[in-house]
């Protein structure tokens, strides 16, 4: 049968189109205005000015940002002496990674239900002009002053549509104030999306020094094991981890009758260490794709797992993902801002920044 040349060309173009569609997913996009972030950060846009002018900077309805606990400014403002920094924009390109506990009807039952969306992971990835990568985590319980509302509160409470800007813009304004770092781009993922990404990689390796668990949400044996997305998520967000005390014991019905005790030292900071370890472990999995098809499966999983800002194109986002393969993950600086524990008068546990962010990075030789 004679095949029409034009038909061959058409089929070729169609195949290329299908191939490109599969490679470049349809990420959810969100507006992100760096100029608005600057205005919020400087205090030029606040809830007071909005009430005075009647101006609205966001069409989104306010949502529950998590902890509504507000601390008395005159009592706690003296604790924020390190919450400002020189600008360091010229040193890095910065990416803000926000992990939220937003649930949907498809979310794992072990995580329960919750209204609204809280910033459970706040991670800044900084890339200098030598392509050296540093990861800086900000604990969710860090005490800050919100430049929009002027409330003194935990930093995760600033991830909300409070009238000044979007959730990401408001959080970026807080970060600009306490770090001197302008966020260039952000990416946001939910619990469900996080699980989906890990499952698309056929699991991720987690190594622990002790057999540990939290209720029925996870149990990890001492050593290294490859786990699915649900178990990995439950592990990094766990606040009530227990460790095995002695030998693992089962009764005649196979029920666990072992002795378990609370893990000592569990805190927001230990959760951050787990988050960083897991993210690097994920990056290493990306670095070791066995085939292009496995890469396609991973990229396709991102379609409903991430939200990215509108200032970065889908093509650029895909290139960034592919370029992760070139990173020497052993040389990534994993940092957590130095903090101290503080208990408020009503018994709330918060963290206080112990060192100015500029001085902190200087001490790590990252501003040379």
Task: Name each region found by the language model.
Residues 4-7, 11-12, 18-368:
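Non-catalytic, solvent-exposed segments at the cell envelope interface
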């Amino acid at each position: 049968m004679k095949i029409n040349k034009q038909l061959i060309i058409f089929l070729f173009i169609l195949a290329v189109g299908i191939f490109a569609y599969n490679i470049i997913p349809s990420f959810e996009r969100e507006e992100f205005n760096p100029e608005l972030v600057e205005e919020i950060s400087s205090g030029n846009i606040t809830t007071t000015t909005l009430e005075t002018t009647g101006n609205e900077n966001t069409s989104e309805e306010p949502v529950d940002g998590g902890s509504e606990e507000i601390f008395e400014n005159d009592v706690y403002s003296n604790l924020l002496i390190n919450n400002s920094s020189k600008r360091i924009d010229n040193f890095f390109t910065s990416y803000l990674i926000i992990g939220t506990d937003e649930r949907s009807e498809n979310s794992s039952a072990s995580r329960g239900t919750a209204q609204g969306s809280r910033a459970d992971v706040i991670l800044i990835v900084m890339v200098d002009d030598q392509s050296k990568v540093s990861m800086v985590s900000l604990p969710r319980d860090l005490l800050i002053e919100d430049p929009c509302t002027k409330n003194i509160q935990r930093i995760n409470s600033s991830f909300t549509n409070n009238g000044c800007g979007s959730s990401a813009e408001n959080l970026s304004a807080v970060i600009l104030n306490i770090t001197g770092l302008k966020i260039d781009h952000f990416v946001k993922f939910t619990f469900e999306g996080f699980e989906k990404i890990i499952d698309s990689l056929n699991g991720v390796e987690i190594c622990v020094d002790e057999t540990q668990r939290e209720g029925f949400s996870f149990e990890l044996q001492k050593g290294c094991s490859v786990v699915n997305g649900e178990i990995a998520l439950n592990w990094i967000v766990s606040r009530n981890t227990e460790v095995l005390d002695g030998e693992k014991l089962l009764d005649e019905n196979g029920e666990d009758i072992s002795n378990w005790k609370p893990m000592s030292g569990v805190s927001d900071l230990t959760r951050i260490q787990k988050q960083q370890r897991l993210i690097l472990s994920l990056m290493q999995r990306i670095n070791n794709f066995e085939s292009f098809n496995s890469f396609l499966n991973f990229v396709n999983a991102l379609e409903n797992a991430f939200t990215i800002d509108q200032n970065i194109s889908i093509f650029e986002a895909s290139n960034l993902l592919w370029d992760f393969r070139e990173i020497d993950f052993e040389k990534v600086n994993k940092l957590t801002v130095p903090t101290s524990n503080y208990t408020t008068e009503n018994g709330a546990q918060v963290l206080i920044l112990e060192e100015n962010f500029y001085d902190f990075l200087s001490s790590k030789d990252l501003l040379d």
